[in-house]
Amino acid sequence: ESGAFLFGNTGETLASADLVIANLEGPITDHASVSETSVIGARDNYVFTFDPSIARLLHEEHIGVVNLGNNHSLNFGKEGVARTKAYLTDAGVAYFGSPLSEDEHFLIRDIRGTRVALVNYNEFVWQGKEKALADIVEVRGEADVVILYTHWGTEYVPATDKMKRLAREFVDAGVDLIIGSHPHVIQETEVYQGKTIYYSLGNFIFDQYFSPETTAGLLVRATYDPATEQFSFEDIPVTLKNTGQTVLTQK
């Protein structure tokens, strides 16, 4: 199937947004896939890479920015991160959350006159919390809105107490919205100090078909009103089919 097949009927929803942000769970490299030829459960079964054509596909499917701050972005080392950034740039897709200490970890974009800062918290890098807090402080004075994209927690279970403590600490530091990934299941949403926390959106395009929980995900349409300085949200559920296609969940 063509790459567009993977996105099913989500295209119109994605195209309607001013900016679509996604988590890219692995590097884009010229290397052959390791996990594809490995034994399920073996260590190398979790070494991911994407074909270079994926960068152009992301652009064609209206994904404008991707988060690189996750536990698979270094699967092919520094060279893998460098190739990923190059392929994304060539395709017109921006990125933030690089796991390399020498890179800038955040991105600020102007969206209809509102300066939006995208910051990453990656639980799986050294001093991830400290780096995220430093970035939040740095961008707080430059942006109208700070969105924190977190890669955190425990897979396949509800949000942990540790995640909830961290979320509050990040909001207290100046974050306006938290969007979480890594658990591969939808976790709860809560409001703290007037700020919304999505602990995990679950999967979007991923090959985990072994439970109802891993075949469910959320797209979140976040609309910011500069007059009130408040967000409103629409949760858009999606279903991952074992054909590899993701579709809007039928109501």
Map each language-model feature to its residues.
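Acidic, metal/ion-coordinating pockets
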Residues: 1-251
